[in-house]
């Protein structure tokens, strides 16, 4: 079925001899300009689409590929070449106030084609829209605003993919809306969806690990706990200050009842996140950051390696250092960037010794990126990372370079 869907999409791209035209509103060269007109919640639509003749759909997408040479404690696998992903967007305006958008991702390493987003939006009022289908839960900012060409780094933030389960999609529905006045903009989202299961504490990582739930494809048809996952977010933006968002995701994750008989206590997980982005005056430095706190009700019979409290986040700084016409590229930009990251999967102390539990890491990643156009980025990164095991033994030290390209098409 997935293969047929991809073939259909590719066929649409070639079946028209009419010249395609990209919506100029989506080709703003300045990231700052696009941010002023939108919130992170608009990321699913704030992409370049190509209209093909009189076909009722618009297409788009992006691809990512990179080289890396990374080693841990002096041991390296040498040069590695990776085609990370190719993603296709399909959008359609069904009628006035009704539209559809989907995001289909192919990851060769995972040997799978996955639908990450496929939802129908019905607008009743700018502050009241109904969304139904396969949604991206708005926890933090990265989960919704994750397109590779928007970032100066070859790797996604560790806290977004190894603490939170980005990209995290579920079957569900809910409401969203936004409004603005003068320099201010306000937006909200509230969804009920399927969600997590026992795999977050029963996995090969042998720790509390939310991303393990992504492997359960049954969540798109069946909710193990029988109780919906709630995800909500509010965001406020001022054009001269930036955007701040507060989000929450929580619900019962375990199977606590079977055939009407209670077989376990209800066990909840709660995730709180805050995100912020702004462009600093004078130097035009772009800053974006996200931090999340995770609380999981772990059974008392589990060992202490399964943490009930976790937290982590990242901060990105991007400084334009050169902007000029190069070859046929107008306003090509050279950036210097830096990412700082921290994740702790097990906050607390051992009951027997009172010493701190480990299982954490920190990372620093300087980068240089070149954007010939706003839609394409070439990026050279160096990562240095230290990770401690649960016993706080001397950390494993990882370092190395990566170079990659990511572009919309």
Per-region residue spans from a language model:
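A generic structural micro-feature
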Residues: 53, 80, 112, 165, ...
